Amino acid sequence: MSPSLHPLLDNGITKGDPNFPGGNLYCKCSSDKVVVKLASNVAHNHACGCSKCWKPAGSLFSIVGVVPRDAVSVTEHAEKLSIVDASAAIQRYACKGCGVHMFGRIEKDHPFKGLDFVHAELSDQKGWQEPQFAGFVSSIIEQGFHPKGMEEVRSKFHSLGLETYDALSPALMDLIATFTAQRAGVLSANL
């Protein structure tokens, strides 16, 4: 039996609506759920194999995208949120009750500061952007996945029409490199 990439991928990808306006994310608690309102659709939605992202039980990958920071608001039970790892670049706010990561925020100087990382699957609304690529694919080995299974994992992604990377997509890596070059003064800040 092949491994589960993620429930949103295992049976094919459902196309999102490019005009989707956003919606609410809910933690997995049976009562007193944390509710996070997103005032926009996600962008750069992707499967992520890193060891930091929240993943559904049995899944090798998370599905995570970004929204503008000012599009994120906690509307119910903010008191249940705590930061998972204060030393990480992305401050992941998780529910203390169920452990689900509700959003991740970057506070330090970083190419993605101003964007919050979210798991749109925590919404009961349909229309969120579908996954665009798979990132940090090799990182699942660091979490115990046998290296001999990597060809099958990459083949599954390719059969879904998703490119696989061992970092982020080229467009996002270009953004990081541009930020770094501008900070170093080798590129103009006004491109």
Swiss-Prot record:
InterPro entries: CENP-V/GFA (IPR006913), Formald_GSH (IPR014185), Mss4-like_sf (IPR011057). Residues 20-166 form the CENP-V/GFA domain. Disulfide bonds: none annotated. Binds 2 Zn(2+) ions per subunit. Keywords: Lyase, Metal-binding, Zinc. Zn(2+) 1 binds at residues 27, 29, 95, 98. Gene3D superfamilies: glutathione-dependent formaldehyde- activating enzyme (gfa) (3.90.1590.10). NCBIfam families: formald_GSH (TIGR02820), PRK05417.1 (NF003829). Belongs to the Gfa family. Catalyzes the condensation of formaldehyde and glutathione to S-hydroxymethylglutathione. This is Putative glutathione-dependent formaldehyde-activating enzyme. It comes from Aspergillus niger (strain ATCC MYA-4892 / CBS 513.88 / FGSC A1513).
